[in-house]
């Protein structure tokens, strides 16, 4: 049924001053006051009892709305007229409806068991400052939530698996203890014996360690520390760990099951052959007219020809360290008191000019093998010096 809402009348516009006129114009088919028992239209007070206002005969035909419902219906009808006319609705008409909806929602939806509030799609937190970590049932964490977070420090990273151990603990567990390094050092020693590069030579770890096996323990501490800082190799740690603190020459335990006497005889034989083929290697150092200050130039190794460190055999590149501690101590004392010989670029290039040195080669006890190893990196002249001394001693 259409209602006569043709236009806004002054009475409707001024509904706050005259609510009776607005009600009459909006709802002409409804009475503003309830009917009396006799039907004469006499209104009774609001404080009158229900039986006095509505007799049993008229109680069967009660009006469809109460007084409060009439007021709300009038307000909604007025808002509807504003919407139809295209006029903005005054805020004082909207606020009562909003308050009514808030009270209605608080009455039906704000139950403590449900926890839902009006105009909210998710559950409200009854304790905002508490950690929201739960087990899905009744338990909840009692700690305070961290700033800018819904959880405490413990439950902030709940997605990670906390049963795993920290990374630092795993690294310590995976690292080998010092005792296992000694047991597994035999394999690197055997692998180093087959290499042709001087970087895998066992002389360097022996020099780097002050108490290491081989010739390193017979050298002065200052010389050993100086060479140890220069000749440090990546694979020198297992050798130093094996040889440190012991007096045994461990280099000969990784080359096979031959006895030490057989290996000494083989080294001396090859050293004698090398000294015969290359007599220019055996210059006496005490007759050298060049002091230490004359070493202003360090020539390249191209003058060596075929006698380069890479062309030397494996046996020639091994240092000679089985003559004893007394013999090496004498050599170390001689080394400090002697001057260095000229380098390769200052020597004669041909073998004819070496004929005058034949007599000097016979007197081989006047120079030490340790000094010769300074100019020849592979220390092949150590074997020549040692074999010559043993020959003169016989």
Swiss-Prot record:
<feature type="domain" description="WRC">
    <location>
        <begin position="125"/>
        <end position="169"/>
    </location>
</feature>
<dbReference type="InterPro" id="IPR031137">
    <property type="entry name" value="GRF"/>
</dbReference>
<dbReference type="GO" id="GO:0048366">
    <property type="term" value="P:leaf development"/>
</dbReference>
<feature type="compositionally biased region" description="Low complexity">
    <location>
        <begin position="170"/>
        <end position="180"/>
    </location>
</feature>
<comment type="similarity">
    <text>Belongs to the GRF family.</text>
</comment>
<dbReference type="InterPro" id="IPR014977">
    <property type="entry name" value="WRC_dom"/>
</dbReference>
<comment type="subunit">
    <text>Interacts with GIF1. Interacts with GSK2.</text>
</comment>
<dbReference type="Pfam" id="PF08880">
    <property type="entry name" value="QLQ"/>
</dbReference>
<feature type="domain" description="QLQ">
    <location>
        <begin position="64"/>
        <end position="99"/>
    </location>
</feature>
<dbReference type="GO" id="GO:0008283">
    <property type="term" value="P:cell population proliferation"/>
</dbReference>
<keyword id="KW-0804">Transcription</keyword>
<dbReference type="GO" id="GO:0005524">
    <property type="term" value="F:ATP binding"/>
</dbReference>
<dbReference type="GO" id="GO:0006351">
    <property type="term" value="P:DNA-templated transcription"/>
</dbReference>
<dbReference type="Pfam" id="PF08879">
    <property type="entry name" value="WRC"/>
</dbReference>
<protein>
    <recommendedName>
        <fullName>Growth-regulating factor 4</fullName>
    </recommendedName>
</protein>
<feature type="short sequence motif" description="Bipartite nuclear localization signal">
    <location>
        <begin position="158"/>
        <end position="165"/>
    </location>
</feature>
<feature type="region of interest" description="Disordered">
    <location>
        <begin position="156"/>
        <end position="180"/>
    </location>
</feature>
<feature type="short sequence motif" description="Bipartite nuclear localization signal">
    <location>
        <begin position="130"/>
        <end position="140"/>
    </location>
</feature>
<keyword id="KW-0805">Transcription regulation</keyword>
<keyword id="KW-0010">Activator</keyword>
<comment type="function">
    <text>Transcription activator that plays a role in the regulation of meristematic function in leaves, stems and inflorescences. Transcription activator that plays a regulatory role in grain development. Positively regulates grain size by promoting cell division and expansion, leading to increased grain length and width. Positively regulates the expression of genes promoting cell proliferation. Activates the expression of expansin genes to promote cell expansion and grain size. May promote grain size by activating brassinosteroid responses.</text>
</comment>
<dbReference type="GO" id="GO:0048316">
    <property type="term" value="P:seed development"/>
</dbReference>
<keyword id="KW-0539">Nucleus</keyword>
<dbReference type="GO" id="GO:0045893">
    <property type="term" value="P:positive regulation of DNA-templated transcription"/>
</dbReference>
<dbReference type="GO" id="GO:0005634">
    <property type="term" value="C:nucleus"/>
</dbReference>
<dbReference type="InterPro" id="IPR014978">
    <property type="entry name" value="Gln-Leu-Gln_QLQ"/>
</dbReference>
